[in-house]
């Protein structure tokens, strides 16, 4: 245990009317050891908590992964008239974002004869007159009925700008 002794003189101005009387006694300070509360977990409990955190993180990643959209480019960087990718799969309820990649006017029309029965092509397609004219413009659709859907760009269908999506 350590002790500290100190002494100091205090000078008090005379105009206050106060006077220091006598001498200052040395004081001692004692250092008292203290303990800090440390949570104690067994190694087994710690590993259990880490395992639960890993499972929760993985589950969140899977759920977030299902909410992600698939991006399909309308037109290639080289000027080609194509959907990129042209043949792909999505989960039922997954959003598909068709994005104009070039300055050409494009649209997305689902072929009413090449989609699952009971699906209304007009509800999932752009109008044939409606176009994405500028780079970066998008059209979004979510398909819920499982099956194969064929689609095309009406201004460039004759040039082979067609695609297919399989909904699982």
Curated annotation (Swiss-Prot):
Keywords: Chloroplast, Copper, Electron transport, Membrane, Metal-binding, Plastid, Thylakoid, Transit peptide, Transport. Its cofactor is Cu(2+). PROSITE patterns: COPPER_BLUE. It is found in: Plastid, Chloroplast thylakoid membrane. Its main location: plastid. Signal peptide: none annotated. It comes from the Eukaryota. It is a peripheral membrane protein. Disulfide bonds: none annotated. Pfam families: Copper-bind (PF00127). Gene3D superfamilies: Cupredoxins - blue copper proteins. One of its GO terms (molecular function) is copper ion binding. GO terms for cellular component: chloroplast thylakoid lumen; chloroplast thylakoid membrane. Residues 70-168 form the Plastocyanin-like domain. Cu cation binds at residues 106, 153, 156, 161. Belongs to the plastocyanin family. Participates in electron transfer between P700 and the cytochrome b6-f complex in photosystem I. This is Plastocyanin, chloroplastic. It comes from Spinacia oleracea (Spinach). The lineage of its organism: Eukaryota, Viridiplantae, Streptophyta, Embryophyta, Tracheophyta.
